[in-house]
UniProtKB/Swiss-Prot annotation:
Occurs in two forms, with unmodified Ala-1 and with acetylation at Ala-1. Keywords: Acetylation, Amidation, Neuropeptide, Secreted. The modification N-acetylalanine is found at A1. One of its GO terms (biological process) is neuropeptide signaling pathway. It comes from the Eukaryota. The modification Phenylalanine amide is found at F8. It is found in: Secreted. This is FMRFamide-related protein 1.
Length: 8
């Protein structure tokens, strides 16, 4: 997933 920063 490129939205890895959303993996809180």
């Amino acid at each position: 997933a490129k939205d890895n920063f959303l993996r809180f």
